[in-house]
């Protein structure tokens, strides 16, 4: 059974973009235990998404300041969004 500490380690590894295999080693859990635990997989994904959120927030702020490279990157994020037709 995974402890809260294991789950925290898994989420932190996700945030740092470690692979799932590396995450299991760092969190000291078996790959099978990780794969069979929906909460562990959710926490890993959550960590990854939170890190992406932070990066995108930095890109957004720099684009708003007019940094050309960041404007281009931010525009690429916008271009990937599919808006529903009204």
Functional labels for PLM-detected ranges:
Residues 52-86:
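Amphipathic alpha-helical protein-protein interaction segments
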Residues 7, 41, 56-57:
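Residue-level signal for cytosolic alpha-helical hairpin/rod architecture
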Residues 13, 26, 36-38:
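Residues in the recognition helix of alpha-helical DNA-binding motifs
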Residues 1-18:
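Short, amphipathic alpha-helical "recognition" segments used to contact nucleic acids or chromatin
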Residues 35-52, 83-84:
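Short, solvent-exposed alpha-helical "recognition" segments
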Residues 22-24:
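The alpha-helix within a helix-turn-helix
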């Amino acid at each position: 059974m995974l402890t809260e500490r294991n789950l925290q380690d898994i989420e932190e590894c996700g945030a740092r973009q470690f692979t799932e295999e590396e995450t299991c080693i760092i969190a000291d859990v078996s790959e099978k235990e990780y794969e069979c635990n929906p909460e562990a997989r959710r926490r890993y994904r959550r960590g990854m998404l939170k890190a992406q959120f932070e990066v995108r927030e930095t890109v957004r702020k720099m684009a708003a300041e007019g940094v050309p490279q960041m404007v281009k990157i931010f525009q690429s994020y916008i271009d990937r969004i599919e808006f529903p037709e009204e």
